[in-house]
């Protein structure tokens, strides 16, 4: 089991009593996607990878600002923090799309069919 476990060193601004809310924000923002892998499903002919998370909801910055370890960067180096947060947001979206493809391998085939080149053309 891999889990997001807020701790005192994260510096949750709302306090450790709000760690469940912080965890919810981590998941909703896409910072910590929820998924399961059950190899026993493979023997049943099923996909062993199950994505439980919904698409990131755009609350990444809210999540990051709620923890001192991330908020300190924004306070000290706002331009660099913005650049890094923008990059992280993009990477989270790309990672979520990757997880969606793992959860639905047929979508990979459909994407490939959509991108097929006309007869006689090569990439």
Annotate each PLM feature.
Residues 2-83, 87, 100, 116, ...:
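Glycine/aspartate-rich loop-and-adjacent alpha/beta segment that forms the canonical ThDP
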């Amino acid at each position: 089991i891999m889990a997001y476990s807020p701790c005192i060193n994260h510096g949750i601004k709302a306090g450790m009593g709000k760690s469940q809310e912080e965890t919810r924000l981590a998941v909703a923002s896409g910072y910590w996607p929820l998924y399961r892998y059950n190899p026993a499903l493979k023997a049943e002919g099923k996909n062993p990878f199950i994505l439980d998370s919904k698409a990131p909801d755009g609350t990444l910055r809210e999540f990051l600002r709620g923890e001192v370890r991330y908020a300190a960067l924004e306070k000290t180096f706002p331009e660099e923090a913005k650049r890094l947060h923008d990059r992280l947001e993009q990477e989270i979206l790309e990672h979520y799309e990757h997880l969606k493809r793992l959860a639905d391998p047929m979508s990979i085939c459909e994407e490939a069919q959509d991108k097929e080149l006309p007869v006689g053309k090569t990439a």
